[in-house]
Amino acid sequence: MTFHFTVRDDKQIRVIIDTDADCEADDPFAIAQALLTPKFMVKAICAEHFNEAGSMERSFRTASTVVQLLNSDVPVLEGARTPLAGLHLASDEDLSPASRAILDEALSADTHPLFVLCLGAITNVAAAITATKN
């Protein structure tokens, strides 16, 4: 998509979208809007679970479909399959790809502000924060 304006580099922000995209219809619209917003440098889309078995996988597929339809190359990553209480996080190796990406982006040398847009459960974010304590 071509825009008739640009956003200066120092005004852009890094964004990670953490979403239970298959739970309700608003998340795919939010993903599309974020991907089309020139101010946002969307670094990753992280699939979240919701209150059904296999929900993270369904969210992953829905988010992947939105990314494909918009011809975007933003990575869609699998997140936690259960709430934090059900996760075993003895070490960083136990993190899901989504939590690892959140942690890595937060610790990167990039000086652009980082925002994590949580559109559902926050298990992936909580796991990343918990990993910093280990």
Regions found by a protein language model. Give the residues of each.
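N-terminal acidic, glycine/proline-rich low-complexity segments
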Residues: M1-N134
